[in-house]
Amino acid sequence: DLLGLHRSVSVEARRLIQEATGIPPQNVLISATHTHSAGTALGKNRYVNEQELDNYQRFVARRIADGVRCAVNALRPAEIAYGTIDVPEHVFNRRWRMREGSVKPNPFGKTDGVQTNPPVASPDLVEPAGPTDPAVSILAVREPGGRLICVYCAYGLHYIGGTGPAHISADYYGMFCEALKRLQPAAHQPGGDAAPPFVAMLANGTSGDINNIDRLHPRPGRKPYEQMRDVAEDMAQKVNAAL
């Protein structure tokens, strides 16, 4: 759970994974979340393709590789399934076409026809500048004919925010994982080598233009964590129903 992950961290993690397990880099997919209430592994200059890693980036790469090594050590026969469900009620395009003359000139002296994060319920709103993607992609793995081992999901929604002051938080991604685990009997079985714990994961899908704010309908103020918890619980219920 990070603000962002630089390509160089991913490259180093793949190298360490191959070194520890023999899995070639081209067989490794690394995904992340995007939260403004966590640290960053983007480094000093996120805009370069290659960079020397700082101490935190090296730590992140090592922990990614450690996670893969632990998974390899717990390998067992499994069945895999995949699918999608639509959860459209939480995703809104934050790029809006605005009434002509309502947008201030940009730094280059020209006027954009589209504004990012315009004021909620502004009379200058015309229409969203693009679509949303309501799909929650689901990848589920279980023991043959038995208990779930893990569920990996992706959803095209920015972080939600609304934490306490200076709090570190995995945002709705972390809350979704905890909610889904509570709904799974496999998560409550005894641990040990015979039954590794159920793992739930949620990745950030393509969501550069998408957030959780309905620009047309103002939402009453909410307590810290309340909105992200509502979204996470709702998503977990719907994913669980689809499993």
Please tell me what each predicted stretch does.
Residues D1-V199, A203-D209, I213-D230, L243:
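Conserved beta-alpha junction segments in alpha/beta enzyme cores
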